[in-house]
Amino acid sequence: MASKRALVILAKGAEEMETVIPVDVMRRAGIKVTVAGLAGKDPVQCSRDVVICPDASLEDAKKEGPYDVVVLPGGNLGAQNLSESAAVKEILKEQENRKGLIAAICAGPTALLAHEIGFGSKVTTHPLAKDKMMNGGHYTYSENRVEKDGLILTSRGPGTSFEFALAIVEALNGKEVAAQVKAPLVLKD
């Protein structure tokens, strides 16, 4: 069976942990992850001044699709940049239309709202993004640390990054693989 494939869209101002932890955990699970720079292949400055080098530009990564999951990290500026991107809208619409998984964390889910993705779904966000996410009544809000409703998977923030990543692994590769990946991470149960 071919490896599952993930596209992580990295925008300037993305939250570092919400980017790197899911990438690392998915790769541990054998998922082929492409970190795609929204503005190109140049290094991206994240919200806490950590610089991440994308694997590809979003334009090039899009040509290699489709992906089993599209992942949107949070960070206020990162989420704003994702929300304002026509390329992100196109990728999310294609992913939704082909019934592919879409995962977003922290402020990242606000890009779903901006691009009219997953309306009617139960979602969660960082507490400070809740009001923005609920504007217009297009979603049902959950206080869960990770919420999966059909093909929309959302999470709350940096402190839920491991749970978010493991939920993606479980959705793509099953509970057994997620448990195998989790065990050596020495996470608190």
From Swiss-Prot:
The active site is at C106, H126. It holds the Pfam family DJ-1_PfpI. Its EC number is 3.1.2.-, 3.5.1.-, 3.5.1.124. Changing C46S: No effect on mitochondrial translocation neither on deglycase activity. The modification N-acetylalanine is found at A2. It is an enzyme of class 3 (hydrolase). CDD domains: GATase1_DJ-1. InterPro entries: Class_I_gatase-like, DJ-1, DJ-1/PfpI, Prot/Nucl_acid_deglycase. The keyword Cell wall biogenesis/degradation does not apply. The record marks D149, G150 as: Cleavage. Changing V51A: Disrupts dimer formation and strongly reduces ability to eliminate hydrogen peroxide. The keyword tRNA processing does not apply. Homodimer. Binds EFCAB6/DJBP and PIAS2. Part of a ternary complex containing PARK7, EFCAB6/DJBP and AR. Interacts (via N-terminus) with OTUD7B. Interacts with BBS1, HIPK1, CLCF1 and MTERF. Forms a complex with PINK1 and PRKN. Interacts (via C-terminus) with NCF1; the interaction is enhanced by LPS and modulates NCF1 phosphorylation and membrane translocation. Interacts with NENF. This is Parkinson disease protein 7. It comes from Homo sapiens (Human). The gene is PARK7.
